Design a protein with these regions (language model features):
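Structural transition elements
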Residues: 1-38, 56-61
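Proline-centered turn/helix-capping motifs that create local helix->coil transitions or kinks
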Residues: 1-5, 43, 108-110
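Short coil/turn segments at secondary-structure boundaries
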Residues: 2-8, 46-50, 171-174
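Short, solvent-exposed loop/turn and secondary-structure capping segments
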Residues: 4, 62-64, 111-114, 182
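Extracytoplasmic/peripheral linker and loop segments enriched in polar/acidic and small residues
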Residues: 25, 76-93, 113-181, 205
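Ligand/substrate-recognition segments at binding pockets and active sites
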Residues: 29, 33-106, 147, 175
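Long beta-strand-rich cores associated with HINT superfamily self-processing modules
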Residues: 177-205
Length: 205
């Protein structure tokens, strides 16, 4: 499961333990029910929404699982909608959705390739999230020269995401690799999943 937006394997990123990791599932369920009730939803007035995803068997399975859990735990009525890629992109770009499935693979091996997506002016900000403190933290991190200070800024940004939930990360991409023990320099901690031959070498065996 994903406890942060930024993958844990990202170079230089040292995530703090999130609220999701500190509480039991029962406690989290109770909080979700309380938030729904505070928003005016409940058994007599269930929240109804559409979950949009681009056509794919794996995306469909995840969407069905999410809808089932939301119904069972929270009484939410979820309608599933799948669209072919071009139509899906149009819906995503115009904001024509209630909840949408999306993913991101880093452009470079540093946390800002993920966290920058939720800044208010980023073209990839599908959630249309706007938070001045969040924007300020990313700009501040870009000026820092102390790695510990950068990590602190990134963790504060992750906390804002956790508190305000513009997105709900559920998993991170992983790829299995079989690497001979005499092959060294293969980048294990790299969310790009890019391996450059110039960094690898073979030891005597």
């Amino acid at each position: 499961p994903a406890y942060h937006f930024t993958p844990d394997v990202t170079a230089g990123f040292k995530p703090e333990v999130s609220l999701l990791q500190q509480q039991s599932q029962a406690e989290l369920d109770a909080q979700a029910k309380a938030l729904l009730q505070a928003a005016g939803y409940g058994p007599n007035n269930p929240l109804k929404l559409t979950l949009l995803y681009n056509t794919s068997e794996s995306h469909q399975k995840i969407a069905i699982a999410v809808a089932s859990m939301w119904k069972k735990k929270l009484g939410i009525d979820v309608k599933l909608q799948n669209q072919e890629w071009k139509t899906y992109i149009d819906s995503r770009n115009t904001g024509n959705f209630d909840v949408i499935r999306a993913s991101w693979v880093g452009d470079y091996n540093e946390a800002s390739t993920f966290l920058s997506l939720l800044t208010s002016t980023h073209s990839g900000n599908i959630a249309k999230f706007k938070n001045a403190d969040y924007d300020k933290l990313l700009a501040q991190a870009g000026r820092e020269t102390n790695p510990a200070a950068v990590t602190a800024d990134y963790n504060k940004m992750e906390q804002i995401i956790a508190d305000q939930a513009p997105i709900a990360p559920i998993y991170q991409y992983t790829n299995g690799r079989l690497i001979k023990p005499w092959v060294k320099g293969y980048p294990i901690t790299n969310p790009e999943d890019v391996a450059y031959s110039q960094t690898m070498y073979i030891i005597k065996h």
